[in-house]
Amino acid sequence: MRTNEREIPYNYTSADDDQVITHLFGPGMLKTLENLRTKRVTGRSARLLFRFMGDMFIIERNPFIFQDFVDHPVKKRNFFKSIEKDLGIIEAGARENRVFQVIERCREYLDTLARRINTISSEQKRITKALDTIIGRENIYFDPFTLTAHATDATDWRLYPPLAVVRPSKESQMAPLVAAIKELGLTIIPRGGGTGLTGGSVPLTRTSVMINTEKLNTIRGIKQFKTESGEAFSGIELEAGVITDHAMAAAREKKLIFATDPTSAWASTIGGNLAENAGGKTAVRFGTAIDNVLSYTIVMPHGEERFVYRKDHSLTRISPNETLVFQVKDAGGRIVETIRLKGDQIRKPGLGKDVTNKTLNGLPGIQKEGCDGIITSATFILHPEYNLKKTFCLEFFGNDMTEAGRVITEISTAFENPGDEAALIALEHFDEEYIKAIDYKTKAAGHGKLKAVLLIDMVADTEDTLDLGESLLGAILAGFEKTELIAAKSSKEAERFWRDRKRLGAIAKRTNAFKLNEDIVLPIASLADFFDYVDRYNTEEKRYNQNMLISSITAYLDTAEPLEDPQWLVSKTERAREMAAREQKKIALASRESLEEETHAQDFYKGVLELLRGYTLVTETIKEIYTRTSSRLIVIATHMHAGDGNIHVNIPVLSNDREMMKKAGKTADDIMAKAVELNGVVSGEHGIGVTKFRHLSKKKVEAFNSYRTRVDPLGIMNPGKLSDIDVIDRVYTPSFNLLGLEAGILKYTSLESLAATIANCVRCGRCKAVCPVFYPGKNLFFHPRNKNLGIGSLIEALLYVTQRTHSTRFKILHHLEEIADHCTICHKCHTQCPVNIDSGEVSVMAR
């Protein structure tokens, strides 16, 4: 590990120098440079070499900068001349063979980049020529804005932008489109709403064409069907790009329930829901996507269309002992395969959700995360609405989650098999970290500190049944003194209760919108043990952070240089060390409550400031250390679909702090290990993607690889996904937690306010549904989520241009004008945003 992890300039990402070097040149180059480190004399060659790497990294990752070189040949020629001059200077000063090898590798990379820039226009023409007759030129995108918006999903992890984005407008176009892309020798990534939480649609190669299904958004209607036994039921036929909320609304109009309702229903799409086997708050009653799908169409990697139909649908949540039969037909209607699946193959026995069995006996599409084809349409069963619904809010008070865990377990068990009795179609929990993040207003008088909240929707067909359900709930809670029950008195009040649940994205605001967002599933009986584990983990992280706070301040005092009276500071420093030792001993033995209040760390901090009163420079630095160290506290925040044990674990993290990122990564690994220890699984909704692949069992990986090789031997679909165990170490995220020169540039160019305003965007897509300039039928995709990604990339480009050329003549700003002009300033997005971004104001600032 180098002493200075950030010698490569223009790197406004989470990647440290080791990661950048490995990304560009492979691990061999990193080893060579480590060996050459001790050979530096003046360091000039190293600075030029690292600047070269900074140039290459940002040109590769930023479509606006890359396109700028394509559009301006003279600028490109001058730039490459200056790079060659720098490499020549390094070469002239070289004294050993390894340096010449490094220069040769750099020139090879430079030649490759030059070829890419010189040939990209002809490559785009080749792609357009092949696809134009299938989907139309207007549905083929190479512009930097679109490529940037498709470089990541809700995770913000990324590696490469896509080569192109295509948006078919008819389902019939999909099969020939896939076949044509295959003939071009390119790979394919399916994408719907971009709401994925594991990086499933993040491009991992330079040659991926992303097929966006958002224009396939027709709701074909609600129809009547019959099971093989003659039982009538309703179903809804949908194209893959239909937004989940729209499907739910269409069902609601007919007093029916569309049960596949992930939290991201405002932006997620039907195809993605099936590819992930998504569930949501009603999964406790009706199951996930696989429980509710009747049939679907999928285009396989070679362009063949397949129709998959579930025979004799049970119209209920799949039981562990049930056997499902799916028939797979080709485009001519011929049955080519019959797949049988047992309930315990879909979900591990004892669990409410489980998406870790990727193979599912070879069932196409479902749970495959876009690795075996593209789902183009589907029919889902619909459930009759209950006549009555009542919403309850449970508030848990106290210093730990012990009682909350027991209450949730007892409620879930009591209402497990409702039959004709009152049923719970939603049990949604969030903990104290979310309570703080969303500024939750306590509804009950309480018994002290609010520890967690549980929202419940209880349904029934008669008043008597609903009353009995409420009585049962009250009886369960009678033995729990720290739990308060509040019933919503009206539908409007119920809506207000649930509004808090929709604002949980605010958890990442403290760390500029980046967090590790994982989900696990546990047996209901293990919930109390897990809550206790999280409580203890968070307590120990507070202990660690407060120790680090004191250690960092005392370490600074050993090197502090005051403007006056340095000899007096020496004696005061010795006194500060004594205070530090005393308070650190107390921290080692401190209770949860004491650590929560930061009692001993605060005593030390205030004591040191008082001790050094008058040493303004020193005390101001101590305040900065306090703020910086406190912000590095690792916190596990949890919310969950309580009825099926599906827990969502969020760890907010500062993406520019590599050590914090590593610590957060270890925390996520610890959570996964604990889930397995408690007989759970590492995902019930989010999928595996790039973030969880290393936690998938070897047996499941081998089974999926075997299936994938059979259906996609050329590796056309979603390359790198669910196959590269080290990919999580290669992806990175942008980071505008900038200091020094970059912050000064932002201020000088009037971009500081713009950058600060969009910095908290969590890419949830809630803005999309209400945005007038999101209109797929008219090729308008300028909703705030996409715009914020584009603006962030443009700010990065402007920082680079300013630092690299020492100029503020920004030709690249015309892209910002285009983004800003696509806004009606209606402010509808503002009311939807969980982190309170007013994108109307963003557009005004951009203009």
Question: What residues fall within each predicted segment?
Answer:
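Ferredoxin-type iron-sulfur electron-transfer modules in oxidoreductases and energy-metabolism complexes
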Residues: 662, 737-758, 774-847
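Flexible, glycine/charged-enriched surface loops at secondary-structure junctions
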Residues: 66, 128, 137-144, 258-263, ...
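Flexible inter-domain linker/hinge segments
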Residues: 85, 89-119, 177, 246, ...
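FAD-binding subdomain of flavoenzyme oxidoreductases
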Residues: 218-228, 234-409, 413, 716-718, ...
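Terminal amphipathic helices with adjacent charged low-complexity linkers/tails
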Residues: 82-100, 419-515, 543-589, 784-787, ...
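Short amphipathic alpha-helices in soluble, non-transmembrane regions
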Residues: 127, 131, 180-181, 407-412, ...
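Activity-critical C-terminal alpha-helical subdomain
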Residues: 507-511, 516, 545, 572, ...
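N-terminal flexible segment immediately upstream of the FAD-binding catalytic core
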Residues: 1-179, 197-234, 263, 381-382, ...
